[in-house]
Amino acid sequence: MTDSTYDVARVRTYLQDLQTRIADALGALDGTPLATDAWQRGPAERLRGGGCTRILEGGRVFERAGIGFSDVAGDALPPSASAARPQLAGRGFEALGVSLVLHPRNPYCPTVHMNVRMLIATKPGEEPVFWFGGGMDLTPVYGFEDDARHFHQTCKDALDPFGVELYPRFKKWCDEYFFLKHRNEMRGIGGIFFDDFSEPGFERSFDMMQSVGDAFLQAYLPIVERRAELPYGERERDFQAYRRGRYVEFNLVFDRGTLFGLQSGGRTESILMSMPPVANWRYNWQPEPGSPEARLYSDFIVPRDWI
């Protein structure tokens, strides 16, 4: 850590505003406002604090859209948060962040995930340790190269002011993180992912996190606007449900945010709002060679330089 001076109030204000801005934009696009569910945990519970969930289900564009803000504290960092820093195991902590997953109705519209967060680990008699994490990644059912290039270029543009080395570093991290080991396949086309980030100090790290959060709508909404009205049929919806099964597998088996929430006694409804509304599994299914479904596997959910 380069310093231990930080301003949680500023981070909290930014995150709450980010949630509102994104929820308003999605509601305007869909034509249905996102519902608001504010929640609070009691002081005697294992995880203290509260948050707000903005949720849309059964919309015109989004079959499910969830954006969660939370600011919680606990007495001991769970294993998922301290795996990379064993010296912090057992410390008290505060975690605040915004996390979203959007599942569009149209199979030609990709699912997207974005998260920005800050964690502070504390121990009596020692300086607090803080770090930022987050990123965004795109999970298409049917791939479009111009969508992938646009998404990755927007991510790069958000990071370049803080160092041209960050995009390739965070892109590689994303490719490796969102990988289903038991399937030997990527979850989607990636994006950027970072964690344990505080190298430049609080101000610069916070600015970088804000740049990522602020870039989300520009990265994603133009893609939805291009694809949301494309015609589709039962075949495309079936493949969408099949690919959503992979999303479920990753979130429940590998995702550090999901594991952190469940291990720390988090709010289950908020943690699992990332699940798709419909998913299915087929035994040993393979796409027809040369089909659009096969092209997802050969051309998109493989490590690739998009820009």
From Swiss-Prot:
Active site: H113 (proton donor)
Location(s) in or outside the cell: Cytoplasm
Pfam families named among the record's database cross-references: Coprogen_oxidas
Catalytic activity: coproporphyrinogen III + O2 + 2 H(+) = protoporphyrinogen IX + 2 CO2 + 2 H2O
One of the GO BP terms on file: protoporphyrinogen IX biosynthetic process
Region ranges (Important for dimerization): 247-282
Enzyme Commission number, as recorded: 1.3.3.3
UniProt: substrate binding residues: S99, N115, V116, R117, G265, G266, R267
Gene3D superfamilies: Coproporphyrinogen III oxidase, aerobic (3.40.1500.10)
Broad EC category: oxidoreductase
GO cellular component, one term: cytoplasm
Gene Ontology molecular function terms on file: coproporphyrinogen oxidase activity; metal ion binding; protein homodimerization activity
Primary localization: cytoplasm
Cofactor: a divalent metal cation
Coiled-coil ranges (or none): none
Site residues by UniProt (Important for dimerization): H182
Binding site for a divalent metal cation: H103, H113, H152, H182
Pathway: Porphyrin-containing compound metabolism; protoporphyrin-IX biosynthesis; protoporphyrinogen-IX from coproporphyrinogen-III (O2 route): step 1/1
Keyword tags: Cytoplasm, Heme biosynthesis, Metal-binding, Oxidoreductase, Porphyrin biosynthesis
The family this protein is said to belong to: Belongs to the aerobic coproporphyrinogen-III oxidase family.
General function of this protein: Involved in the heme biosynthesis. Catalyzes the aerobic oxidative decarboxylation of propionate groups of rings A and B of coproporphyrinogen-III to yield the vinyl groups in protoporphyrinogen-IX.
Subunit structure: Homodimer.
HAMAP family in alphabetical order: Coprogen_oxidas (MF_00333)
UniProt-recorded name of the protein: Oxygen-dependent coproporphyrinogen-III oxidase
Species annotation: Burkholderia lata (strain ATCC 17760 / DSM 23089 / LMG 22485 / NCIMB 9086 / R18194 / 383)
The gene coding this protein: hemF
